[in-house]
Amino acid sequence: MKTMINKFRLYYLAILGGLVLITSCNKDLEQLAPIPTPVYPTGNGVAATLAANANYSFYSALITRAGMTTTLNDLTKSFTLFATDNNGMRIFVSAASGGAIPPTGAPDATYLGFINTNLPAASAAGIVQYNTVGQKFPAASIGNSFPNYPITTQIILDPTQPFVRMNIFPVRGTFSYVNNVPLIGTDMAAANGIIHTGFSVAAPPSATLKTMLAGETSLSYFRAAVARADSGQVGLSRFDSLMNYGVTNMTILAPNDAAFQTLIFGMVYAQVLAATGNTTIATTQANAAVALGPSFFSTPAFYGTLPASSVRGIVAYHLLASLTTSTTSPYQPNIRVFSNNVPSAPTLVKTLVNGSIAAHPGVMAQATYTGPAVTSLKFSSYGSFPPGGAPFSYTANAVTTDKLAVNGVYHILDKVLLPQ
């Protein structure tokens, strides 16, 4: 009986406690200040602002073709748009038509006809979405540090994760750019945003680095070197997997086939000459190694000349990197360096080699400019070929620049850079 009484006592105490709470909750609710109704701007939105300017009639047509007019005129939202004027659109139409339409001189109706009819609506949408940012970025707010200031566009990379989006890369300086396109005008005001004007269209990429590199006929040795460097690696430790990972942000310096042929000939020649002292034998063997083509890297007889670890070091030296806060992988390939991001003065840039040797100075990069245009781009390596040269005396020229992929950019070089 005593036990039952104790149980009921606890039961009643619980009920009474609840009643106290209920009684307390019956007090008048605190009156909070009403949430103010947002005050939205009035006037022309981004699309309407361009439509009202005759010098942007072609880009206005592009917005219409893209089905983005309503979005860009929504005064409850804010935008930054990297657009281009009619001159820039003429350049774009000429390129998009494969040169069938000249960059100047054709009637306006010809350019508008291509935009309104020949350009796929999906392509137009991709261009406008890629150049649209969902907040205001006045020119003064765009970063000026190396290499650029990545900001999020309207292109969603993963439909299951709507916040994982493609970036675009403006930078502010003596000359300002979006990606590698010079900005010729900034801060055109619209009621709901800001419009910056590029020299032409900054086109969105559509393939990963792996896919684009696979299509380069002059990079067969580089692809073979990557395969050799990936021996024994798994996951994103494989360069091949990293180059196919859509949400990375990389810069690759890819030596062309002639560059690798020169390196292979020289290394085999030096090795055989040191062993035999016979220049004829050394030349014959070096020519035979070059004759193997890219399969040189998968031929066991030459594994001693270029072990997989050495090839991995060489490939890593051609991927630019920066220092992060990660304690496991402090140096990561997370910067997208366009040619116009490279200073005119020689500048050291870290690479993935720094992941193993933090004190390594990296590669030395230098660009030459005529106005906003990059007229030459070169990279010098710490090591030289033949060995024995002063650090950074061995220089490769970029023969192709600014090949833009979803997950990075690459430049094709005429020499293989050596980390030591």
Positions of the model-derived regions?
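Mature, structured domains of secreted/extracytosolic soluble proteins
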Residues: 2-8, 25-420
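Sec-dependent signal peptide recognition
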Residues: 9-15
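C-terminal motif of bacterial Sec signal peptides marking the signal peptidase cleavage site
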Residues: 20-24
